[in-house]
């Protein structure tokens, strides 16, 4: 029998809990610990914290990250924040513990253009300790970037890449509905965008990944964020959005050439009550 992969779950929020339950189903993975600073979760059994039907698992949730990392995990599944700057200390500690990392941090999905100094620091640390790390997820990490690149593989050359993603956020968890500003007035939404609070994180990273992977000469990456205004009252399990309030985000990322030509166009509409959720990719070339 092959040796099982020893894994630690770093962050036991809604996403981390779902990941932990999925890992529990994998015969090749052994969960040896978890990390979370929340006093309501720390020092408890992971299976009980995530509400697993087969709990307890005999797996401790540590408040002290280093104590968990000292267990010598093969891999740390990391899901604590969207901001690369905020999680640098966490990631570097995992690398120093000689554990590989799979992270849901959106800005880690392709940080080479948007955070070149942080990317270089992580790359150097990973090489020093002989491990690897990757940022991934559904979006960024797949639908609006890697899938675009994969579909382009059947072409000789791509001259322009476009993707449109429409998501009905009413079926998503409450943290996401809050992150996209659902239920705010339009003025509140714009103020929160200006403060950097309201946005889908990772769209510039997706633009950069597509541009570099398809060898498109993108010089400038731009991003616009506008409210998707509700045309009728929409109620979700968690919030109610009145007509005229922000229902979510309408976000566009563009990759422009030196002369201003649009080479990459990624549009995301993520709002509660979306009528026709879909993903559309358009590639121009030959």
Predicted segments, located by residue:
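Short gly/pro/ser/thr-enriched loop/turn and capping motifs at secondary-structure boundaries
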Residues: 40-42, 108-112, 140-143, 167-171
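General beta-strand structural signal in soluble alpha/beta enzymes
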Residues: 33, 103-104, 133-136, 162-163
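N-terminal glycine-/serine-/threonine-rich beta1-alpha1-beta2 phosphate-ribose binding loop
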Residues: 1-96, 215
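Short, ordered loop/turn segments at secondary-structure junctions
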Residues: 37, 81, 99, 105-109, ...
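Active-site-lining helix/loop region of Rossmann-like oxidoreductase modules
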Residues: 10, 14, 152-283
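Rossmann-fold NAD(P)-binding glycine/threonine-rich loop
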Residues: 88, 92, 97, 105-131
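Alpha-helical support elements that line or immediately flank enzyme active sites
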Residues: 142-153
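Conserved active-site and cofactor/substrate-binding residues in soluble primary-metabolism enzymes
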Residues: 10, 14, 18, 71, ...
């Amino acid at each position: 029998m092959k040796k099982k992969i020893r894994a630690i779950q770093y962050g036991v929020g809604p996403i981390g809990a779902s990941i932990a339950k999925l890992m529990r189903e994998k015969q090749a993975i052994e969960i040896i610990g978890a990390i979370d600073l929340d006093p309501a979760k720390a020092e408890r059994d992971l299976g009980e914290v995530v509400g697993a039907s087969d709990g307890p698992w005999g797996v401790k949730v540590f408040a002290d990250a280093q104590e968990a990392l000292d267990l010598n995990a093969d891999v740390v599944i990391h899901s604590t924040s969207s901001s690369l700057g905020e999680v640098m200390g966490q990631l570097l500690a995992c690398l120093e513990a000689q554990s590989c990392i799979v992270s849901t941090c959106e800005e880690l999905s392709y940080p080479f253009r948007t955070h070149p100094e942080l990317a270089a620091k992580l790359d150097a640390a990973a090489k020093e300790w002989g491990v690897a790390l990757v940022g991934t997820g559904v979006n960024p990490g797949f639908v609006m970037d890697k899938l675009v690149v994969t579909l382009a593989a059947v072409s000789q050359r791509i001259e322009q890449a476009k993707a449109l993603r429409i998501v009905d956020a009413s079926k998503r968890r409450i943290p996401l509905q809050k992150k996209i500003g659902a239920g705010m007035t339009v003025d509140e939404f714009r103020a929160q965008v200006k403060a950097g609070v309201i946005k889908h994180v990772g769209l510039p990273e997706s633009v950069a990944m597509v541009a570099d992977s398809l060898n498109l000469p993108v010089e400038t990456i731009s991003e616009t964020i506008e409210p998707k205004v509700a045309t009728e009252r929409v109620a979700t399990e968690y919030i109610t959005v009145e007509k005229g309030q922000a229902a979510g985000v309408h976000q566009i990322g563009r990759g422009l050439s030196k002369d201003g030509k649009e080479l990459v166009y990624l549009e995301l509409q993520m709002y509660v009550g979306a009528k026709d959720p879909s993903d559309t990719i358009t590639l121009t070339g030959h």
